[in-house]
């Protein structure tokens, strides 16, 4: 007999929602049992700052970026911002990196 396989499912949101709606969507995704929430790197807000804020609105859901093009950010500042989200979220950051 085959054992069932648990497949984690995430949700990708646009960041163009007003803040109260975006925070509510993040809480709803967490309550619905989604494994992760992703925001695009290019949008209306700074992705890592927004994820840091969403960390305060959630407690379990993992928080991820879309692909961050490495040439678009200073490496040291990206490392600091990522570390800040990682600390603020209790280790829930998924940082997607790419060449552009």
Residue ranges of model-derived segments:
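N-terminal beta1-alpha1-beta2 module of alpha/beta enzyme domains
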Residues: 1-65
